[in-house]
Curated annotation (Swiss-Prot):
UniProt protein name: COMM domain-containing protein 1
Gene this chain is encoded by: Commd1
Gene Ontology terms: cellular component: Cul2-RING ubiquitin ligase complex; cytoplasm; cytosol; early endosome; endosome; endosome membrane; nucleoplasm; nucleus
Annotated region described as Required for binding to PtdIns(4,5)P2, given as residue ranges: 124-188
Function statement: Scaffold protein in the commander complex that is essential for endosomal recycling of transmembrane cargos; the commander complex is composed of the CCC subcomplex and the retriever subcomplex. Can modulate activity of cullin-RING E3 ubiquitin ligase (CRL) complexes by displacing CAND1; in vitro promotes CRL E3 activity and dissociates CAND1 from CUL1 and CUL2. Promotes ubiquitination of NF-kappa-B subunit RELA and its subsequent proteasomal degradation. Down-regulates NF-kappa-B activity. Involved in the regulation of membrane expression and ubiquitination of SLC12A2.
InterPro entries, per database record: COMM (IPR017920), COMMD1_N (IPR033776), Murr1 (IPR037351)
Binding site for Cu cation: H100, M109, H133
Xref: PANTHER family: COMM DOMAIN-CONTAINING PROTEIN 1
Length: 188
């Protein structure tokens, strides 16, 4: 059985299938498909634990966004661990990660973002031309236009108008946010 799971091409294919399912959202890559295409001679009761082990290793490597030194240390530890992986499997995993790291990282970054993202921001300062109160006409106002959207979809726009008091309030809040971020960065 162990020899059946040693094949580099099959393991590389398995890792690709796991990555497609876990990180790229291809739900058609199922356990049954991987088993029948890559390891048809291995009984399901032996394939499932092997699949779970490889899935766990791949998720650990990806979630830690391991660089190549960390990867080598991690895989070396896995080869020495009871019930771990063989050095041949470690070599295949290392080769796979080196060629797929960037795509997996980008996919994880996309998945971690909110649905809509800020695509653009533009602003200008104008003089107010209409108001309920004549004293406010010609007073300066900041006009901010925000562009929101998902990749591959049409944008939505939000236009905001602020008088001098509101601009000062926003700047104060942004300063508080900056101070909070700086405190957190210094603590880390």
């Amino acid at each position: 059985m162990a020899g059946d799971l040693e094949g580099g091409k099959s393991l590389s294919g398995l890792l690709s299938g796991l990555a497609q399912n876990a990180f790229h959202g291809h739900s058609g890559v199922t356990e049954e498909l991987l088993h029948s295409q890559l390891y048809p001679e291995v009984p399901p009761e032996e394939f499932r634990p092997f699949l779970a082990k490889m899935r766990g290793l791949l998720k650990s490597i990806a979630s830690a966004d391991m660089d190549f030194n960390q990867l080598e240390a991690f895989l070396t530890a896995q080869t020495k661990k009871q019930g771990g992986i063989t050095s041949e499997q470690a070599a295949v995993i290392s080769k796979f990660w080196k060629s797929h790291k960037i795509k997996i990282r980008e996919s994880l970054m996309k998945q971690s973002r909110w649905d809509n993202g800020l695509r653009g921001l533009s602003w200008r300062v104008d003089g107010k031309s209409q108001s309920r109160h004549s004293t406010q006409i010609h007073s300066p106002v900041a006009i901010i236009e925000l562009e929101f959207g998902k990749n591959g979809q049409e944008s939505e726009f939000l236009c905001l108008e602020f008088d001098e008091v509101k601009v000062k309030q926003i700047l104060k809040k942004l300063s508080e946010v900056e101070e909070s971020i700086n405190r957190l960065m210094q603590a880390a």
